[in-house]
Structure formats: C-alpha cells, structure tokens
Amino acid sequence: MKSITVTQSAVQKCAQLLERANSVGVLTGAGISTSAGIPDFRGPQGLYVTRRYDPDTIFDINYFYANPAPFYEFAHDFIGLEATIEPTFAHRFLAHLEMIGKIKGIVTQNIDSLHQMAGSQNVLEMHGSFWRSFCLVCAQEYSFEIMKHKLAQENVVHCPCGGVIKPDIVFFGENVKFMDEAIHLAEKTDLFLVIGTSCVVYPAALVPTYASGDIVIINKSLVDLPRGNVVLQAQEDIDEFFKNIAALLQVKISDN
C-alpha cells in the first residue's frame, strides 16, 4: 500500500486548536466516507458515473411519486454497500471527541449513518438516511433491517397497505432537515470543523458561514469559503490527517 504523508504543521495547528477549544461543531460530507467504501456520488468513481444514475431523476421527489423504480435501482446498490461497510478512523475519532465532551454536535450531509455506527450521539442528518423508512400512504415506519429484507424480495418496496415505502432521505423538492439546529451549533461553538465536503450543495454549504469561532477545513480538494474566520485549510487525506492528530494528542482509537 502506498504510504500517505500529511503536512505536520497543519496537524500541529489543528491539534492545538482542538486542545484549546471548549466546544467544537462539525460539518461532514461524502469525503469522510469514501475510505469506508462508499464512492463520492459525483466523483470520477461515484455511483452516478459508474452506474449511470441521473441524480436529477432518482432524487426528484415528484419523479419518485410518479415512478419510484429508478430510485430503487440505486437503493439496491447503496443498501448493499451500507450492509458491508464500517466507520472510518475519522468517524471514530470524532466519536471519541464527542465522548470526552469536546464535540457538541455533528452536522452531516451523508445518508450512510456511519457517524452513529461509530458511536456519535448528537448527529444532525440534513439529508436524512436509510436508517428508517415510511409508507407514503399509512406512514408505517420500517427499520433498516426490514428494508434490507424487503429489498431482497421486491424491486420497488411496498407496505402491506399497498403504499410505496420511501426511505427517510431528503429528495430534491423537499426541505433539508435540522437547518435551524445546524446554524445554532455553528453559532454557539468556538471551533468549527468542515470535513470532506466541498461546500457546493446548498443549503448545507451555508452552515459554516454562521460559525462564530475559528473554522478548520480538512478536504482533499480546495474549499471555497469566505476567508473570514477560516484559520486552517488542510488539503489532506482525512483518515491520515486525524491519525496524525490522534498520535500527537496521545489518543488511542480502537480498530474496527
């Protein structure tokens, strides 16, 4: 395996900021989950490209109401992936920071629930997740495990009442979840981490602009945020970056 190096000055600065901070908020995007085996949806190896999904079709709520089959083709692939993946080092490190009282909440654009699987408790899933689903007719709730079972038997999953079941994810045409709570988290914390997101999907991209404290960005590509209180932008491999921080802070994170 090719070794990955990270910029030690960036590691040291981020570690110092984490040590000094009394309260930390976090925004995460697809980049934190790619090493778990979930492709970035829009990247060169993303699900939209490799399976030729049209996001304007499969995630449009009105199209889903009219014809849920294209979405469920995607759902078969995604839930198949989700059943086999585990949280990354970065997910587990963030869960540790919450456990010791540093992190007050995580806002995520991801629908994979890996933060919860890693042990994080206060997670705001702005785009929802597959963790639960609802019948569009009778509102009966279904767990992830039941949905997996149903997907193995049906191309488009239905409730016994005959209604189509929709995972609790946000489609185009629906409002994002927890926007007010995400803004409040950014406003009340004295350090805000932006991890694995290019901040191009709105309104989630607006959340860091409400940060009252220092902002640290960790992402493989450059993120264009108003400079304001951005004190560090590290274009790094996310897991390796946090492994170096954990080593510097003498934090032991158990393996998966």
Model-found features: residue ranges?
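Conserved catalytic core of sirtuin-type NAD+-dependent deacylases
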Residues: 1-256
